[in-house]
Amino acid sequence: MEGGGKPNSASNSRDDGNSVFPSKAPATGPVAADKRLGTPPGGGAAGKEHGNSVCFKVDGGGGEEPAGSFEDAEGPRRQYGFMQRQFTSMLQPGVNKFSLRMFGSQKAVEKEQERVKTAGFWIIHPYSDFRFYWDLIMLIMMVGNLVIIPVGITFFTEQTTTPWIIFNVASDTVFLLDLIMNFRTGTVNEDSSEIILDPKVIKMNYLKSWFVVDFISSIPVDYIFLIVEKGMDSEVYKTARALRIVRFTKILSLLRLLRLSRLIRYIHQWEEIFHMTYDLASAVVRIFNLIGMMLLLCHWDGCLQFLVPLLQDFPPDCWVSLNEMVNDSWGKQYSYALFKAMSHMLCIGYGAQAPVSMSDLWITMLSMIVGATCYAMFVGHATALIQSLDSSRRQYQEKYKQVEQYMSFHKLPADMRQKIHDYYEHRYQGKIFDEENILSELNDPLREEIVNFNCRKLVATMPLFANADPNFVTAMLSKLRFEVFQPGDYIIREGAVGKKMYFIQHGVAGVITKSSKEMKLTDGSYFGEICLLTKGRRTASVRADTYCRLYSLSVDNFNEVLEEYPMMRRAFETVAIDRLDRIGKKNSILLQKFQKDLNTGVFNNQENEILKQIVKHDREMVQAIPPINYPQMTALNCTSSTTTPTSRMRTQSPPVYTATSLSHSNLHSPSPSTQTPQPSAILSPCSYTTAVCSPPIQSPLATRTFHYASPTASQLSLMQQPQQQLPQSQVQQTQTQTQQQQQQQQQQQQQQQQQQQQQQQQQQQQQQQQQQQQQPQTPGSSTPKNEVHKSTQALHNTNLTKEVRPLSASQPSLPHEVSTLISRPHPTVGESLASIPQPVAAVHSTGLQAGSRSTVPQRVTLFRQMSSGAIPPNRGVPPAPPPPAAVQRESPSVLNTDPDAEKPRFASNL
């Protein structure tokens, strides 16, 4: 250095981060022989350089340059260290899908890598990348050896060709290396699933297991063959002794086929890898392994079929000599031998010719045994594979077979069997899963993710879920249960106790109420929440119009979820109040709670906006149907489901003016009443329209179901629709038919009451004497009185006489006064009640003429007699004024002294 340099400094040195020299280290470099160390000019003790400063002088110049770069000095060593690290890492388990599944986490894999480093030199981990690729190479080499070696030994006489020698020498070398590497490869302890990396334990385990088989299969037969060939002359080699040696080497080469054990082990390891990663790939690999093993055995059997005659020098009775194939090409010989072997193994024949010699016979039997075993294994594995590929469909088929046996055992009708079949098709769609058990085995996040995915269409179509908290939606969906309903099924019924609410995923359902309006619910709608909120009964019926796929929520789960989310409870309550208002109903519990929330200020502006949107969307989703043109829907709960065709025809007849409603006040009134008609009141056309258009009266009769008779007069007032009157000829014809039926019934009853005729004759004689005494005073009025007296007395004593018609579902018996009033013609459409002529007998006296008894038309439905013999009174019509005192004294039995006469009584089946 010129002018003296600082110690510990190097002039013109490059500061690249790697020029760090150890203290007191001699300067070395590749150019040290061509350059010499220099000192500063006029050097002295003070001008000496520090030992760590490496400088040199170039001839002919005073400049200084470094003696050599550290990178040049450490390059080979650094490259060797990199290769060593890479090779060492290949002996360790890598971080991949297989190792993560084996050890659980990346941290556990790193710990296993540290174990391999501390285990010793050249210890190979069984799950390392190096062992993976080595096993792949060995798999290919073994398949090649097991296919090529039998063909070469059997069909090729020249064993000294260069390709054959190269192939055999390379194979023997690779298998010897594999034998050595097995002593340095860790093993898996089957009891504890721990990887054993101790070299001594690995060696002992290998010596006790597969070492002998692997050593015999790895004997270098080709090396021995080459040594024997070089030690013999060509003339001696061709002698018979040499040919025997060659045959021995051929037989010895068959020991390589023991490498099949290695092939099976490696294939089993690959099956485990595929099984742990892909289940379907594992099944496919298993079936392909089975097919490949069968083909390999067929290949070996074909070579064996030709090798045995070859070792016997083709005797005359062998199959090769009989078919004259000794001098044919090896391809033709192999084809015939393979065909013969497959015929034996599949048990379909003997090939081209049946065996003749004893050796061919034994080989054929051996082939049949091996073939039958392989065929059974193949069928079993194939069956198991097919069943495992679609186990859910197989379970569905087994389940439906049980259902069919159940239907046959109980002898269910064909239409019911078809409904059950359709239900299973729509409910399970050909596959059965134990979904509840599957989801219960998963953790909560994964279960919630699956439920959200399965119900994504329901969430997308429901405005309630769209505006709700995601946690509420997840909690609600996790408690839903899937259900399917068929067209015509009543999902809920009005008046029933509600235990579930429903969400519609797919389908259309109709809401049926007592009013004439029906509403439709489609995808994304929900119903049944009102009774869950109020703990009451169903307010309407819901019927499935199409196949409906629903999700149900029980009342316990409903309350459990809403306790954690009070805002959503208020949303349900608001929608419930709006729905009740739309169908004309109210619920005091919901209204009081809603008013209480308003007074306490629970609702804020944001919540109000959300509730408005929910109610708005709920109204938009409900499809309202226009009012139905027939009024039967107004009495939906009043009519029986077993209505006869006659009663259905009656509901479409013109309005009927019943005699029970004709009181004295009505007869004397100048105009019909304009008030809301009562269930059994007389209706004019205008008042009838008012009754149909107005909501029905909530009376006991309006909610009563009559099971045995036709609709009563109160029901007809709600159900019948004004139409044009029937022609008089049809009315007369109907009356004639009714009269004939009554006469037949009267004759039958007369035969049954022969025992009572004597008592009736005595009563008639007494009545005739009274008539003779009263005839001058009131002519023509005594007979009706007596008849009325007889009929009412019989009804009061609950005894039916011949004067009273028998009670039946189609022809109820009535007092003669009522039948006489009904026999009058009906008023026209525009005629008022004042124009009806008043019956004289009804005004002046309580009796009627004896000859005025008429029949009741078939299209008229009247009250039936009760078990007590009285007619049910009408609560909607004011009672008639009492008759005169004279009439009361003469016929006291006409009056009804029963204190319960004003209570409503319904028809009963006698």
Curated annotation (Swiss-Prot):
So what does mutating residue 349 to A actually do?
Abolishes conductivity
In the record, the effect of residue 303 to S is given as:
Abolishes conductivity
Q: From what superkingdom does this record's organism come? A: Eukaryota
* Extracellular domain ranges by topology: 154-162, 226-249, 308-333, 356-360
Q: Where is the composition biased (Basic and acidic residues)?
A: 900-910
Q: Where is the composition biased (Polar residues)?
A: 780-791
Topological domains on the Cytoplasmic side lie at 1-131, 184-204, 271-284, 382-910
Q: Which family does it belong to?
A: Belongs to the potassium channel HCN family.
* Name by which UniProt lists this protein: Potassium/sodium hyperpolarization-activated cyclic nucleotide-gated channel 1
Organism, by scientific name, is Mus musculus (Mouse)
The organism that produces this protein has a lineage beginning with: Eukaryota, Metazoa, Chordata, Craniata, Vertebrata
Gene name, per UniProt, is: Hcn1
